[in-house]
C-alpha cells in the first residue's frame, strides 16, 4: 500500500454547486492555476455534459494546467462520457469520473431502475470510458446508504472493466467516522480484485463530520485518495475541507503515516481567492484559514506562545501561507519593489500590462492610505486579475455623495458604458442604497440583489473595505467584488463588476450532483 495520499480537489465542480457560487470560465481558470501551484494531484474542473460553459472551462483548463491531472465528471452513459473525453483532449494527464446511484432509495425513486440495470450500466460506462483513458474513476452515488452485497458486486465489476479509482460517496453526509471507515475497509476486504484500484473517499458535511469521516476512511479503511474542496465549499453544509485534511495529515504524520505533496504555503492565498470569487466569507474561527486560526487572546496562552510557540501552536501560521500583518510598502516605493514583494508573496500576474495596472492601483491607494499591508497588495492584484478577465461593458469612474441628518442620502455615480460616460443620480435609504439606485437608474438591469457584504482587508480606520455583491436575473446568479478605502466606492465597484458578469454571454449551469 502506497504511503502517498492523493488530494483530489473538486472546488470547481462540487464546490460550484453551492447556491450562489457559480463561476465564470475565467474565474475557474484562476482557481485552477492556484490549485496547480499548490500541487494538487487531481483537479475536477467540472461536469462537461452539464453545459457548453462547463465544457469550455474544462477544455481550457486541460490545455493550461500541466502539473495536475484534470478530471471531468460524467454520468454513467455514453453521451456524458464522450463529452468528458472531448473536453479533456488537451490535458497532459486526464481522468474521467463516472457515477451512478447504488442505494435502494436512489435506484427506486430517482433512477427508477432495478439493481441489475444499474449494475449493467455501471459496468458498461467504465468499459466505454476506458476507450479514452486508462485513468477512470467510478463513484457509487449514495454509497454509504447502499446494500453492502450489491455494492461489492458493482465495484468488483467496474474494477474488472478497468476502473482505477473507486470513490465511496457519502453523498448526503449520513456517515459517522467509525462506520464509514469500516465500510471502506470491508469493501476492500470483500472485493476480490480491490487491489487493482485505489480507494477514495468523498464526504459531505451535513452532520459536521466530513473531515472526520474522510480521515476515518483513510486510517481505518485504507483509502488513499480524499476528495475535498477549498474552504469546504459545497452545496448544503459543504464538502470535506482540503486545508483541514492536508494539515491534519501533515501535522499528525505520526498517526496517519502518510505523505501529501501539497505546497501548504499556498493554502491561505487560494482560500482567499475562492472566498473572493464566490462571495462566501470564511468564518473567523475556521480551522487553518480563518482569521482567528492562529490568534491567542488568553493571557496564559499569549505568555506561553511568547516563551515557546509550540506550547499552544501545533502548526506555524507561515506554513499555511499566513503573512505577518506588517507595513511593507509606501507611496515612495517603486515598481521594482512592488514586483519583488509580489514574488515574495507567491503572487503572479499573467502579463506586464496586468502588472502595470496593478502598480498604478497600488500608487493610487498609497496616496490615500498611509500604511500598505501585504493583504492590501493581494487584494489589489486579485481585483486587477478579475478586471483583466471581465468583459468590461461597464466601468466605474467616480462617485460623490451627500448626506444630512434627517434627509435621505444622495449619490452621484459616473461610469462608462462601452467607453461612453454616463451619470446617474439617486436617493436611497443609505449611501449604498442611493449608489445602487443611481447605477440601476441608468442601466435598468432588472436584477435582484441577493447579497451585500463588507469585509475589512486589514485593521484600523484606514483599512480597505472589500465588498461582495450578488445579483440574480432570470435564474442566473453572479458575484461582483470591489475594494476601496471608501466603502461606498467599493460598493459601486462591486455592483458594476456584477453587472459586467450579468452582461457577459457565458453559458453556465450549475451541474447536478454526483
Swiss-Prot record:
Transmembrane segments: none
GO cellular-component term (any): cytosol
Subcellular localization, as worded in the UniProt entry: Cytoplasm
Catalytic activity annotation: 3-methyl-2-oxobutanoate + acetyl-CoA + H2O = (2S)-2-isopropylmalate + CoA + H(+)
Cofactor: Mn(2+)
Positions of region (Regulatory domain): 395-514
Assembly: Homodimer.
NCBIfam families the record matches: leuA_bact, PRK00915.1-3, PRK00915.1-4
Name of this chain's protein: 2-isopropylmalate synthase
Organism: Burkholderia cenocepacia (strain HI2424)
